[in-house]
């Protein structure tokens, strides 16, 4: 019997100790939020957990996400700047998407430490890392939208795209996008603070009920409804155009990438946004009881952790799917990694570089990033 009880305790310990910048604002950290006796039966709702087990599991999990995401996005940045030289608007958006993921990822080591211990970095750093987390989160969403619009212009309005899709315009729209991401992150930054609670320090937002509702609605609009509308409209036009394309190989490659973008993004982030909405408005929806509250609390931790892993997938979807991008990556490793291991192969490197440069012209490169990245 004792062994049978270990698995549920193990799982519950992982779920209940996961750090969440968003969920604390809608649970026990709100000022004026639900108290243990606010439920209809008048009984206290004790959210017990096996915190030591979660403290063992979550730091390695966050660390793995950080390592894989950091390496993948740094490779994207190196290839875009060092090899592709940022020659198109698509390159600009891909670069900024990788930067968004890096901002998000840089906070994970600190949340890993927080999951195992109390918050020891002070109030200022609590706000700083919360800001980086939110800015990276919103920035990633907005640049996914810009990449979708960029793809739409390149395929559906190819003539207009020749004039509109410039590096200069890409830089301008990227700056505006970062400004919007900062403004979208302000509520989370302003209401977040570190305070002592039950003899240990925490870091999380302390929203009033009004701001809590506003934050949840804004997040669902910006990170779920808006991307969904843009993707449905743009990809409908893209698919209609591609199905008339005579180049069967190019058409299938582009369609595969488009569906990967849609499915992966919504697969990783839609569950979180739904649970966030249900948790915030559970009382209005008639779901205010201890059992449901516990299940939503656990679901919130799982879905946010799932969403956090999306930053590891972005380099694969937006960069490494492209055939010529993979060739650039291969050349980079052979020149800068393998060359240090084998310094007697200069002819091999020169032949590889000549072969790729002969197949990658400005026109073919632009077609690659426009259709298949």
Swiss-Prot record:
GO biological process entries: angiogenesis; apoptotic cell clearance; blood vessel remodeling; cellular defense response; cellular homeostasis; chemokine-mediated signaling pathway; hemopoiesis; homeostasis of number of cells within a tissue
Intracellular or extracellular location(s): Cell membrane
Side of membrane Extracellular, spans: 1-55, 115-127, 192-219, 282-298
A GO-annotated cellular component: fibrillar center
Tissue: Epressed in mature thymocytes. Detected in monocyte/macrophage cell lines, but not in nonhematopoietic cell lines.
Residue(s) carrying Phosphotyrosine: 152
Keyword ATP-binding set for record: no
Entries under InterPro entries matching the protein: CCR1-9-like, Chemokine_CCR2, Chemokine_rcpt, GPCR_Rhodpsn, GPCR_Rhodpsn_7TM
GO function term, MF aspect, one: chemokine (C-C motif) ligand 2 binding
Cytoplasmic side: 84-93, 150-166, 240-256, 323-373
Induction: Up-regulated in the dopamine D1 and D2 receptor-containing neurons of nucleus accumbens shell after spinal nerve ligation.
Post-translational modification remark: N-glycosylated. Sulfation increases the affinity for both monomeric and dimeric CCL2 with stronger binding to the monomeric form. Binding of sulfated CCR2 to CCL2 promotes conversion of CCL2 from dimer to monomer.
Keywords assigned: Cell membrane, Disulfide bond, G-protein coupled receptor, Glycoprotein, Inflammatory response, Membrane, Phosphoprotein, Receptor, Transducer, Transmembrane, Transmembrane helix
Result of knocking out the encoding gene: Following a stab wound brain injury, mice show reduced extracellular matrix deposition at the injured gray matter and reduced astroglial scar in the cerebral cortex. The injury site shows an absence of invading monocytes, significantly increased astrocyte proliferation and a decrease in extracellular matrix synthesizing enzymes. Following traumatic brain injury, mice exhibit markedly reduced early macrophage infiltration, improved locomotor activity, improved spatial learning and memory retention and increased neuronal density in the CA1-CA3 regions of the hippocampus.
Protein's UniProt keywords contain Hydrolase: no
Disulfide bond positions: 126-203
Domain of life the protein comes from: Eukaryota
Membrane spanning residue stretches: 56-83, 94-114, 128-149, 167-191, 220-239, 257-281, 299-322
Bilayer topology: Multi-pass membrane protein
Function per UniProt: Key functional receptor for CCL2 but can also bind CCL7 and CCL12 chemokines. Its binding with CCL2 on monocytes and macrophages mediates chemotaxis and migration induction through the activation of the PI3K cascade, the small G protein Rac and lamellipodium protrusion. Also acts as a receptor for the beta-defensin DEFB106A/DEFB106B. Regulates the expression of T-cell inflammatory cytokines and T-cell differentiation, promoting the differentiation of T-cells into T-helper 17 cells (Th17) during inflammation.
Subunit record text: Interacts with ARRB1. Interacts (via extracellular N-terminal region) with beta-defensin DEFB106A/DEFB106B; this interaction may preferentially require specific tyrosine sulfation on CCR2. Interacts with NUP85; the interaction is required for CCR2 clusters formation on the cell membrane and CCR2 signaling.
Family: Belongs to the G-protein coupled receptor 1 family.
Name of protein: C-C chemokine receptor type 2
Name of the gene: Ccr2
